[in-house]
Amino acid sequence: MHIAIAGNIGAGKTTLTKMLAKRYGWKPHFEPVDNNPYLEDYYADMTRWSFNLQIYFLNKRFRDVVEISKSKDTIIQDRTIFEDARIFAPNLYDMGLMSERDFNNYTDLFDLMLSLVKLPDLMIYIRCSIPRLIDHIQQRGRDYEQTMRIDYLRGLNERYERWIKTYKGHLMIVDGDTTDFQDNPQDFKRVTDMIDDRLFGLFPME
């Protein structure tokens, strides 16, 4: 089974992935951040490095999806291949940070990859406001994120909302503004109750 966590930068995807992996005994797949050779350069000069970064993520995410499809374990994934192609790359293009040539090349490659993979069994989307995202980003203190532009973050959030309205797979939405799953056990239980209902309830997903 493939469970995926989606959400903007700072939404709490990695935290929730770790907590759910521990709670259910699922195998976690985390977003490759610490060893990413492009990330610091990208935040310093987005126009120069946007295509390189997005191809790096697309490659890693596609590899993850292929591995997940072959696994007999239940995998919970921190961020998905769909977010790269439907959120981040188009946002960079619209902001003038990725050329039309690079964007078209990227999109063609993603469409080919998408024809070879299936949707996750359950997509969990963490919805957060901009102030909440900024608070989380400041708390975790990654140097390369501190120079992030607010309009960049806002553009991503708007794209997430448009994308999630058109998503065709099994979907569960967590309100990240009102649900403190990290520090409030009752809030975390509410999240797991929702998951239990969808995966193991009387009328589970088909």
Task: Give, region by region, the residue ranges found by the protein language model.
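Pre-Walker A (Motif I) flank of P-loop NTPase domains
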Residues: 1-2
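Hydrophobic anchor at the beta1->P-loop junction of P-loop NTPases
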Residues: 5
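P-loop (Walker A) phosphate-binding loop of NTP-binding proteins
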Residues: 8
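Conserved lysine of the Walker
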Residues: 13
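Conserved substrate/cofactor phosphate-moiety recognition/catalytic segment
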Residues: 18, 22-60
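Glycine-rich phosphate-binding loop used to anchor ATP phosphates in small-molecule kinases
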Residues: 49, 53-118
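A glycine- and Lys/Arg-enriched "phosphate-lid" helix/loop adjacent to the NTP-binding pocket
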Residues: 87-159
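NTP-dependent small-molecule kinase module
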Residues: 134-206
